[in-house]
Amino acid sequence: MARRAIPVRRIVLKTVLIIGEGDTEKAFLDHLKRLYVTRGCGVAVTVRNAHGKGPGNVIDAAIRHAKNGDFDIVAVLMDTDLPWTDEVRKSAREHRVCMVGATPCVDGLLLQILGEHVPEQSSRCKDFFHARLDRKPFVREAYEQDFSKALLDEKGKTIPSLRKLLALMAGQLLASD
């Protein structure tokens, strides 16, 4: 008598697509994914890069990428230095895209996480942050030393944008603050 195969129990993963506005956003999101999304956690996170060009392009990139896959949650991380027009907000709402803003830019958010002073101008934030990371903010490895899981967990309690990103990494969608 032949052995009967034991059926493999498969779990359905919650799928999350997060689009970063540029290279820095993608590298930071990849770092978060590496820290928070582990095998067997029930979540599959995909990170993509919209390559800039403003909020409209980032939302369009999210919509295009979402059409190529069946994602439970679609979100974008983008700067707030350029205005989010009503048209951009409407498009995001219609396509169920969660918008996470980094004020005034992702470099400012990262400086805030580190407890550093955050200048009002995006260009100054970029200069300060690039100097802080030895000018290598476009690769995931640049974040390993300064952005530990313990620091991110602690700062996630007080920084709304980071709290949303950490929730997305867990497959949860937080209501807008």
What positions do the PLM features span?
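Short, surface-exposed binding/anchoring microloops in extracellular/periplasmic proteins
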Residues: 18
